[in-house]
Amino acid sequence: MTKSYNIIHHKFDVIVVGAGGAGLRAAFGMAEEGLNTACISKLFPTRSHTVAAQGGISAALGNMGADDWRWHMYDTVKGSDWLGDQDAIEYMCKNAPDAILELEHYGVPFSRTEEGKIYQRPFGGMTTEYGKGKAAQRTCAAADRTGHAILHTLYQQSLKHKVQFFIEYFAIDLLMENGECRGVVAWNLDDGSLHCFRAHNVVLATGGYGRAYFSATSAHTCTGDGGGMAIRAGLPLQDMEFVQFHPTGIYSAGCLITEGARGEGGYLVNANGERFMERYAPAAKDLASRDVVSRAMTIEIREGRGVGEHKDHVFLHLNHLSPEIVHSRLPGISETAKIFAGVDVTKEPIPVLPTVHYNMGGIPTNYHGQVIIKDGKNHNSVVKGLMSIGEAACVSVHGANRLGSNSLLDLVVFGRSAALKAAELIKPASPHKPVSEEALEKIISRFDKIRHSSGNISVADLRLKMQRTMQSHASVFRTQEVLDEGAEMISEIRSGYKDIKVNDKSLIWNSDLVEALELDNLLDQALVTVYSAAARKESRGAHAREDYPDRNDKEWMQHTLSGVDEAGKVVLDYKPVTLTTLSDEVKAIPPAKRVY
């Protein structure tokens, strides 16, 4: 089969798959350390989904009032509903201020205070004095286009450090040999050639799989390609049942309205004009954490207090804010609301609805970005040659629920951490370990089989079935009956993949084949998401069970590990949450009731 294709071979010290914030930070960090680094991306780097991040990036700089990284750590652990690993959370929060200053030195054009300091806004779940004080202004912002500013800056740094880019290359599968990763195979969409990239280290920075759902703030390119490759390589994914619904997606369109809108003073109302969040989170109100706000909105709509003709959404008010504040601090969402909801935010409320936004789960890693698996009694056995960072990974700093503005921080802190670890492990230009012909043949055969699929189901129809099933059966509120039914339906949809039809058999710019490969990645992750959710009989963070409304630390304070065997069956396992810190500078935060 390999002889049927034009295969071009490459050798690098490191291959980074994905050119979003995490991938670029790792790529130029590794190049800066003297490693011969390549970055593969299925789209132009500045089109990566990091560009859509709006509100900001968190760090305890203290520019707008007293702050401390330990308070940030407390908020993140509490936000995670005690499913986050406290060693990784300490590492992230402690390194956050330096990460922001580093970005500023690279050229990120942060908004400024009148004194010239980096502007910071309040965000949900961010407090002072270990939750006892007032809301913290911790989120560093570049207006409401922070991700755009960071991504362009990181791309410029990558060019400066001479990272070699392979743009519009679709990563097909990992080259695995004896449990080690030795490279990756990719397809060049521009000329149809296949490329075998050999490397001492492969970094998966491919983002989330939001497009497994019908309505998501994610771009259509967010298909979790790294997670799909990991599952096919026999690796488990972690905590996949935890899917974040952002409270404020524009009704019907799904486009994101940043939490920064509420940070600047925006508030939610129901059909009675009531600021209902005061009932659900008396202290934090509209700036409670995202899972709390999404559930409150869903309850209001269910109980008949929704707005609009069908009473199926709520309103976000910004029209009490001065137009100057809106136009200087929230220019992007003013434009988004005008285009997708037809409203002038200075005069009218924005119709909003909880929308799939972020995957807390992903490829399990340690805080160096190294992929880890459970091997006997060792829960943190490192998979040689493989790293993962960003939304594709599960460190786990977000646990059962991510706090807004911690995602951009996650990208840059662990992108840098992975670069430092790779430099420590790899000697530049050292010889590569061999890869068997069988390993390459297996990857090419799968690619060829999908390319020549001639069944009866269109990729678009099967994808839509999956998306609608996930939207209805793995949503904000869940029950055993609905989850079990969803698991059966997704299993059936996945088995239907054998009968797909790919009409275009060409190799150059074949979007039909790209979508078929992406759907394969999405289906495996949809499958483990719904099975993991059905198995977790408690409510924690974004996983809200109506039949098990309470958190159960005794039985369920543990990470879910989920994989798919060769027969297509989901295999579940569990490992404990890390409740110890890295240093003596901060004490571990014991589990407590989570109220805002």
From Swiss-Prot:
List the keywords (alphabetical). Answer: Cell inner membrane, Cell membrane, Electron transport, FAD, Flavoprotein, Membrane, Oxidoreductase, Transport, Tricarboxylic acid cycle
> What kind of membrane protein is this, topologically?
Peripheral membrane protein
Which cofactor(s) does the record list? FAD
Question: Where does this protein act, in terms of pathway?
Answer: Carbohydrate metabolism; tricarboxylic acid cycle; fumarate from succinate (bacterial route): step 1/1
- A GO term for molecular function: succinate dehydrogenase (quinone) activity
Q: Give the signal peptide as a residue range, or say none if absent.
A: none
Binding of substrate, residues: H246, T258, H357, R402
Entry-linked NCBIfam families? sdhA_forward, sdhA_frdA_Gneg
Q: How does it assemble?
A: Part of an enzyme complex containing four subunits: a flavoprotein, an iron-sulfur, cytochrome b-556, and a hydrophobic anchor protein.
Q: What protein does this entry describe? A: Succinate dehydrogenase flavoprotein subunit
**Species for this entry:** Rickettsia bellii (strain RML369-C)
